[in-house]
Amino acid sequence: MQQGNTATLILLRHGESDWNARNLFTGWVDVGLTDKGRAEAVRSGELLAEHNLLPDVLYTSLLRRAITTAHLALDTADWLWIPVRRSWRLNERHYGALQGLDKAVTKARYGEERFMAWRRSYDTPPPPIEKGSEFSQDADPRYTDIGGGPLTECLADVVTRFLPYFTDVIVPDLRTGRTVLIVAHGNSLRALVKHLDEMSDDEVVGLNVPTGIPLRYDLDADLRPVVPGGTYLDPEAAAAVISQARP
C-alpha cells in the first residue's frame, strides 16, 4: 500500500483457459488452464513479488481456472499461506445456452447483431440453458445451496450478485488497510471495475480485462481509485492484449 492510501486492491483475471484458446463460450463450465495460462499465472506471481505487492487475503471464485491461477501466482511469490475465501458470486457470467458453443459458429448462425447483444451488451442475457444438459450446473454440488445457480446472465446480473458480496465481505478487509487480491473472471472483474470507476452501462460494454496481468487499484479513504482505471503491473503487455481482443 502506497503512503497516503487507505487500501490496495489487486484484480487478476485467470490465465488463458482451454476454452479461451478454443474460442468457446465458457461461463460456469469448469475448465482448466492451458500451458500458456499456467505461464501467465506464474508471471503474475513474479510481477506481484517484483512490485512488493503481497496480499493479506485472497478471494477467488469456485472455478478451477481462477483457483489454479491464484495458487500458481502465490506459490511463485512464495506467499501461499494467506487466508483464502471463495464464493460463487465471483464466478464468470453464466452464458446460458451458449455455454460450450464456438463463438465464431454462433456469430455466423445468429448474426452479428444478436451475437454482440448476447456477448457484450449490458442487459441482454443469452437464451437460458436447459437443466440437465451437458454444460448446465444444476447437479453440481458447489451450487446446491443456490438451487444449481442461474440458467443465464447478462452483465447487469453479475453486477447484482457480485457487488453486495464486495460491499459486505471484501470492503471490510479494505477498510482495515489490508491488501486484497481478487482472482476472478473477465465479466466479474468488469462488474467490479464498473463500480470502482463509476462507469456507465455503455462505457463498460467496451471494457476488456486481459488474462494473467495484475491490475492494481490504490484506494482513498472513500475507497475511490487514486488513479482511475487502476494500473497494470505490466502495462505494455496489457495494452497489447486489449488491442487484440476478439469482438
Swiss-Prot record:
The keyword Transferase does not apply. GO terms for biological process: gluconeogenesis; glycolytic process. One of its GO terms (molecular function) is phosphoglycerate mutase activity. It is an enzyme of class 5 (isomerase). CDD domains: HP_PGM_like (cd07067). The keyword DNA-binding does not apply. It catalyses: (2R)-2-phosphoglycerate = (2R)-3-phosphoglycerate. Keywords: Gluconeogenesis, Glycolysis, Isomerase. InterPro entries: His_Pase_superF_clade-1 (IPR013078), His_PPase_superfam (IPR029033), PG/BPGM_mutase_AS (IPR001345), Phosphogly_mut1 (IPR005952). Pfam families: His_Phos_1 (PF00300). The active site is at H14, E92. Its EC number is 5.4.2.11. Pathway: Carbohydrate degradation; glycolysis; pyruvate from D-glyceraldehyde 3-phosphate: step 3/5. The record marks H185 as: Transition state stabilizer. Substrate binds at residues 13-20, 26-27, 65, 92-95, 103, 119-120, 186-187. Disulfide bonds: none annotated. Belongs to the phosphoglycerate mutase family. BPG-dependent PGAM subfamily. Homotetramer, dimer of dimers. Catalyzes the interconversion of 2-phosphoglycerate and 3-phosphoglycerate. This is 2,3-bisphosphoglycerate-dependent phosphoglycerate mutase. It comes from Mycobacterium leprae (strain Br4923). The lineage of its organism: Bacteria, Bacillati, Actinomycetota, Actinomycetes, Mycobacteriales.
